[in-house]
Amino acid sequence: MQQSTFEKIYEVVKQIPYGQVATYGQIAALAGNKRWARVVGYALHANPDPDNIPCYRVVNKEGRVSDAFAFGGGNKQIELLKEEGVEFINGYVDMKKYQWERPIY
């Protein structure tokens, strides 16, 4: 059975470690197509299992959270990340410190 694009995205998002974040583009590339960044956003907005697919760990390349975070808005996303120890500088995730270092093949 072939995985759908959303399933590929969810599999990558599940791998983001506790206390770290990844970018939409990073998830897109790891899921198979670096041009899927916008699709990653759609997939996360339709997340069927937020308890097991930590979509709140995905931020934009500058480290900004989504105002349209589907599970409580940007403030909820910030709250969830802070609970994991992720620090923010002027409202942005400190990407040098918290970006997931998973290599892209």
Regions found by a protein language model. Give the residues of each.
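Nucleic acid-binding interface residues in structured DNA/RNA-binding domains
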Residues: 1-105
